[in-house]
Amino acid sequence: PNIIYILADDLGISELGCYGQQLIETPNIDRLSQEGMTFSNHYSGTAVSAPSRCVLFTGLHTGHAYIRGNDEMASRGDVWNHKAVLADSTLEGQRPVPAETVMIPAVMKQAGYTTACIGKWGLGYPGSASTPNKMGFDFFYGYNCQREAHTYYPPFLYRNEHREYLNNPLVVPHTKLD
């Protein structure tokens, strides 16, 4: 069977039409639900995003997962400076999981599936041993560094291992707009 798994930050079960929400239309997700399966008793692995993805992709219990928080690797330089990150991709990204980690996408590839991840990664930095493609995804498009997802109009996203510039101006989060 084809498998599409949607994991969304800060999305509650009561916000989708397929679970009874009536104020905001979600027709495409509702159709996926009608034609597939939904979960009514499903919980994230932790309260924050990168550790939840680590738990989901590795199958490890939160207490044994490699990623315990949305940590930046400050030892690499001025990682909180969005302008510096735009100029130097080596400042981007979170702590990587160990290279020998087996993740669900790698297991699915062994079973003959083609795998893709679209959205936030946050489980390593560009060039590390734990980029999405090195962890089993055939295709990745999105934010390598989850912190970059806090900008409304990102200046770049990643297509597999490479930055793809989007011609959006950098708007640093919490900047007062005129």
Question: Which residues does each PLM region occupy?
Answer:
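Formylglycine-dependent sulfatase
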Residues: 1-178
